[in-house]
């Protein structure tokens, strides 16, 4: 009995060893088959790629008919390669499947026979899983090879069907895509270089214009002095109880200052026209020797007429200086009035001439119409001469008058756009705006404190003149007094007091000023008749 048991155990051990040897051989065969399959797949893919490259190069060099034949041959070879690979992979998969089944059956049998072999069975399962992974990997590689073959086939077909022009277009497109970034970078660098060049040229242009124009400028004053032959003349100018000096101040709106300064009378006022009329009147009175209210009225009226002639002469001289020919007489008179207008202390007529010259210089540098540029620059601020008489800004008024007197459209647009109210429609309009900024912004050209003082006095007079029945109004004593002359037929004696209170209220409401402002309303009634 013991012998039988021993023989049975020996038989089991021998059987187990035999099975182990067979399993080991089976594993080696499986690994060998897998390695061979992988190598064959790599070789086949390399051979297919090599043949495809060779066929493509050959197809490119030969004629169209030869390319078609080579493509057919390539297709046939690729098909055969694919069939051979599929057949080999199919056979190998079948063998692996059969081997896997046999190993599974044997492992199951051993598991039923001996529980001690469980650990080895687990190891075998792991190897089986590894084989499955490898099989999956082979399948994926097979799919990749098939995809590569399809892509190569499609590429060969596309290349074979291309003409020379199409092939050139493909190459150019690919090259353009590759160079897009480089092109964009170069364009950006070129734009920066152009901007830098334009800035330099603009600065050079302005520098040349400023160097070629050397103009004198003296800040406008708000006082005028009149020299007397002797100090005795001061008493005659004042008159009995001050009636002469009061008449002169009332008619001209200018402060006549007589102090201890020997042989000098000072005329103070922010309006240059009034101040000049007062100067002309006073000099005529001194020369004539007859100084009384009636003579003062007569000479003031005469001085106003002479002032109109002088204004026209100023306009003609400025137009001749700038070369603005065939100007309408009314425009000449308007420009002459600018001789007695200031902007931040800068004489507006001299500013207009300067802008015209600067615009002409810049136009010549840029190849534009020099005469038209000078004319536009000269007329750009003419609205300032009449902005107190017509509603609107000086730009709107100047544009309207330029159209009224049939000025060139370029001139009209330059006037309308020099402060940016409308878009410039020509290079000359831009030149005029630049020349205006250059003339007014240079150091010393303008004095803001003087302009603020003059503006305050003008606002004071405008408030007084806004009431119905007011004939004229004059700001005196540096704005510390406002003297209003009313129409005697519109304002009665009782209404004079009421009007003064209304004007005072408007001044307090709309103006900021230091100290007090004296409001004087004068109603003068005259009856004139002639004896025959």
Curated annotation (Swiss-Prot):
Gene from which this protein is expressed = rny
> CDD domains attached here?
HDc, KH-I_RNaseY
Q: Which PROSITE patterns match?
A: HD, KH_TYPE_1
Region spans: Disordered: 101-139
Sorted alphabetically, the Gene Ontology BP terms of this entry are: mRNA catabolic process
InterPro entries on file: HD/PDEase_dom, HD_domain, HDIG_dom, KH_dom, KH_dom_type_1, KH_dom_type_1_sf, Ribonuclease_Y, RNase_Y_N
Q: Domain HD spans what residues? A: 348-441
Q: Where in the cell is it found?
A: Cell membrane
Question: What is this protein's function?
Answer: Endoribonuclease that initiates mRNA decay.
Q: Which residues cross the membrane?
A: 1-21
Protein name per the record: Ribonuclease Y
